[in-house]
């Protein structure tokens, strides 16, 4: 059964765009159009432990680093900046690093799996993706940029898990597929792209085409050792699509999870990767689980039972429709579109904190 555990009054002075729990589910970070980030204890009183001020515009998203690096939090904003914060206690926070080399709003940030070190990916409306790597011994940051990652802008970014599928399940799993760093991004060109690090450069490995409008969110599912990878994508076109690959990530197939009543803004996997939470313009949060036949079913909030969603397994979509939608957005897109309007971006989900 799904039920409300707690309600927190953040006391932000404007729209709250995103909330994220830390690795242990104890500290909650929120961000808002008031330009601030606030830290709460998720299991105690509702008063903010700290208020982080450093942005001069709406803050779209926050992301926690793995606790092996300490209490580290990243935030991104319409002001084109990414700020990495560090705390000695939940109440005492300082600015560890500030990155300001994007030409437009920074819409999404995501820390890499801890096996790769302290690495942060950033997605921007200027069409590029930045990968920031910290040398933790010297406290020096290095930035690499993927220019022109998406036409018009990049809305979302997510890392591939470092843990590879178990070779015991599939002999096609190789050490190469396990060791290579990968990212998935979604953009205003209606595309989903998978990027691979190759000789200190980031190259486009796959281009996934199925959405007919802006891709608002992407989420690479946590690995539990099974011989496949899954990526969920959410779009303005009201669809959530789950992409699945074979063990060596050489081929991807798409399945439409559901067609919603309004645009879909945010998606989040459970820590075990078997439940997907979805929220969007219909002001609802729904939970979905894949059955043994590969069909996605919605979990009933009242009883905890599953309800099958009658959807086509694949979404028909032509290249000409994609081009038409892209041209329409090119004509309408502002110079700094940001991730979305306030009303759209108010329903983002906390990352990977769902119960399974």
From Swiss-Prot:
* WD repeat residue intervals: 11-50, 54-95, 101-142, 149-205, 210-253, 259-298
Record's keyword annotation contains Protein transport? yes
Q: Which SUPFAM superfamilies match?
A: WD40 repeat-like (SSF50978)
* Assembly, per entry: Probable component of the nuclear pore complex (NPC). Component of the GATOR complex consisting of mio, Nup44A/Seh1, Im11, Nplr3, Nplr2, Wdr24, Wdr59 and Sec13. Within the GATOR complex, probable component of the GATOR2 subcomplex which is likely composed of mio, Nup44A/Seh1, Wdr24, Wdr59 and Sec13. Interacts with msk. Interacts (preferentially when phosphorylated) with Mad. The GATOR2 complex associates with unmet in the absence of S-adenosyl-L-methionine; the mio-Wdr24-Nup44A subcomplex is essential and sufficient for this interaction while Wdr59 and Sec13 are dispensable.
Report the gene knockout effect. RNAi-mediated knockdown in the larva results in reduced transcription of developmental genes Eip74EF and Eip75B in the salivary glands, compromised transcriptional recovery after heat shock and defective recruitment of Nup98.
What's any GO biological process attached to this entry? positive regulation of transcription initiation by RNA polymerase II
Q: Does the keyword Ribonucleoprotein apply?
A: no
Q: In which tissues is it expressed?
A: Salivary glands.
Summary of the function given for this chain in its UniProt record: Functions as a component of the nuclear pore complex (NPC) and the COPII coat. At the endoplasmic reticulum, SEC13 is involved in the biogenesis of COPII-coated vesicles. Recruited to transcriptionally active chromatin at the time of transcription initiation by RNA polymerase II. Required for proper expression of ecdysone-responsive genes such as Eip74EF and Eip75B during larval development. Required for reactivation of transcription after heat shock. Required for nuclear import of phosphorylated Mad via importin msk. A component of the GATOR subcomplex GATOR2 which functions as an activator of the amino acid-sensing branch of the mTORC1 signaling pathway. The two GATOR subcomplexes, GATOR1 and GATOR2, regulate the mTORC1 pathway in order to mediate metabolic homeostasis, female gametogenesis and the response to amino acid limitation and complete starvation. GATOR2 activates the mTORC1 signaling pathway through the inhibition of the GATOR1 subcomplex, controlling the switch to cell proliferation and growth under nutrient replete conditions and during female oocyte development.
Origin organism is Drosophila melanogaster (Fruit fly)
What keywords does the record list, in alphabetical order? Cytoplasm, Cytoplasmic vesicle, Cytoskeleton, Developmental protein, Endoplasmic reticulum, Lysosome, Membrane, mRNA transport, Nuclear pore complex, Nucleus, Protein transport, Repeat, Transcription, Transcription regulation, Translocation, Transport, WD repeat
Q: Name one GO molecular function term.
A: structural molecule activity
Q: GO CC annotation: what is one? A: GATOR2 complex
Report the membrane topology from the UniProt record: Peripheral membrane protein
List locations, semicolon-separated. Answer: Nucleus envelope; Nucleus, Nucleoplasm; Cytoplasm, Cytoskeleton, Microtubule organizing center, Centrosome; Nucleus, Nuclear pore complex
Q: What is this protein called?
A: Protein SEC13 homolog
